[in-house]
């Protein structure tokens, strides 16, 4: 099930509701994996494809949320590959379906789209310069910021849904 569906006795299964606390925990794991990957990639002075960042910035200017998510995933997956430790990518892959779902629910807001790619570019520069600790710190900050922003936006959306349907908290 991987947390995407839940049993609904007498009705089969339902799509599991989005959960802010679960999402924050997923981001904690992702942040740790990303920091390790960035350190290893920086040790190799990995230079990310500049076209990848350009495509991400372009997607951020549009309205296609799937393209935004795909660009973000491509950036992180490039770092996982550059780390040359297949366990990082395998471990991260377990969590990306949860992240895609949360990102898809909240990325309609344009406020943070450009800052995400500014952060990605700074991470890429640190890796290319061989600054492993800086790359890890930047990607950790990036993950924490993403968790905070997406968590706040998700909380707003969930609260809005509950109040519009008359549910109580």
Regions found by a protein language model. Name each.
Residues 28-43, 73-112, 146-150:
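Hydrophobic, amphipathic alpha-helical faces that serve as interaction scaffolds
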Residues 52-58, 101-169:
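C-terminal all-alpha effector/ligand-binding and dimerization domain
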Residues 34-70:
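Amphipathic alpha-helical dimerization/coiled-coil segments
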Residues 26, 48-56, 68, 72, ...:
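Hydrophobic packing residues in well-ordered alpha-helices of helical domains and bundles
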Residues 1-43, 151-169:
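Short linear motifs at protein or domain termini
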């Amino acid at each position: 099930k991987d947390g995407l569906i839940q049993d609904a006795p007498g009705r089969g299964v339902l799509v599991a509701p989005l959960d802010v606390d679960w999402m924050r925990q997923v981001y904690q794991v992702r942040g740790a994996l990303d920091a390790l990957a960035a350190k290893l990639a920086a040790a190799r002075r990995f230079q990310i494809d500049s076209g990848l960042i350009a495509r991400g910035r372009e997607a951020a200017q549009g309205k296609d949320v799937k393209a935004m998510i795909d660009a973000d995933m491509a950036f992180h997956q490039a770092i996982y590959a550059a780390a040359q430790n297949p366990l990082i990518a395998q471990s991260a892959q377990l969590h990306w379906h949860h992240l895609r779902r949360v990102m898809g629910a909240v990325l309609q807001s344009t406020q943070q789209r450009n800052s995400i790619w500014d952060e990605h570019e700074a991470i890429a520069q640190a890796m290319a310069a061989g600054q492993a600790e800086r790359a890890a710190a930047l990607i950790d900050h990036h993950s924490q910021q993403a968790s905070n922003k997406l968590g706040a936006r998700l909380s707003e959306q969930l609260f809005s849904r509950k109040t519009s349907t008359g549910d109580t908290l």
